[in-house]
Amino acid sequence: MKALQLQEYKKLELVELPMPVCGPEDLLVQVQACGICGSDIHGFDGSSGRRIPPLVMGHEAAGIVVEVGVSVVGFREGDRVTFDSTVSCGRCAYCRAGTINLCENRQVLGVSCNEFRRQGAFAQFVTVPQNIVYKIPDSLSFEHAAMIEAVSIAIHATNRTPRHIGGSVAVVGAGMIGLLCIQTLRLAGFAKVIAIDLEDSKLKIATQLGATHTVNARSEDAVAVVMAITNGRGVDASMEVVGAKAPVQTCFQIVRRGGSVTLVGNLTPSVDLPLQTVVTRELSIYGSCASNGEIPQCIELLASGAIQVAPLITATAKLDETAQWFDRLYAGEKGAMKVIVKPNAV
């Protein structure tokens, strides 16, 4: 089969690889669409330490089942499916407690690190265990279904955030996940959703997708603007979707007394904690990692049109065009958001 392999950092090659072997509890999926994730871009240059070459990356995917393992139940050849990116063991204490995203033996598709190596979906075929696979309706395109993994991260982050129906929330970072969080937070009942970013183009999309207010932190004092919007009180909740020092600090500065800060971005390994602010204002901090069983909910929300992903898709690409898109995305091409790879397109 054809696959796009990271041969060394910043070097992707189209290669021929053996067909994946379908284990007894696995499904062999012909990949119809796979999104290029921001984490793939960070892995491309080795900065994340989680894409050690040689590796086939890609974890946001959808496709058609072409083979089922002998122990698989509930799936058959021809099923249209998507799948989670996190492979959980189902046996550890966290899995048994229902927190599969915290699995002690967790692996991630398209990731290689010191603990494991798992080939991903920038290939014509991929094998995935049946416990992370979900059927999708005929009405949902493969391109949109490839966005479900990203949507599940936004849904999980929203589920981790205390609800304030009619309340206010600020999303710091209007990238892909941030723009999805804006939609899920509106669905959760927040009346004021404030998008904060450094680029007007992203803030324009944020408005189209439901943000009631936008703030360009490059040209405006974000804290002052948010305080003006909330009559000096601060937002009920803030959500950081970048993973860097400055936006994390902004989240703590704009939240009201007794409010909450949800941390989704994890680009920077560590940031300073404003300890006295957290203690004296009695703030609650929530980490949000991947998703925890929200994919069926995401499928329903996309199929019904409650969440829009079409405005976030910049382009589709064949497998032999994908390396060029990695270069463009790595260079920070303005206006580029999600690129969907179609490994079996001719």
Regions from the PLM with identified roles:
Residues 161-165, 204-284, 346:
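Glycine-rich cofactor phosphate-binding loops and adjacent beta1-alpha1 units
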Residues 20-34, 47-96, 137-139:
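Glycine-rich beta-strand-centered segment in the early N-terminal region that forms part
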Residues 3, 249-253, 292, 296-346:
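C-terminal hydrophobic helical "lid"/dimerization subdomain
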Residues 131, 138-220, 224:
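Mid-domain Rossmann-like dinucleotide-binding core that forms the NAD(H)/NADP(H) cofactor-binding site
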Residues 37, 74, 84-134:
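Cysteine-cluster motifs in flexible loop/terminal segments that predominantly coordinate metals
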Residues 1-62, 124, 342-346:
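Short N-terminal strand-loop motif that marks the start
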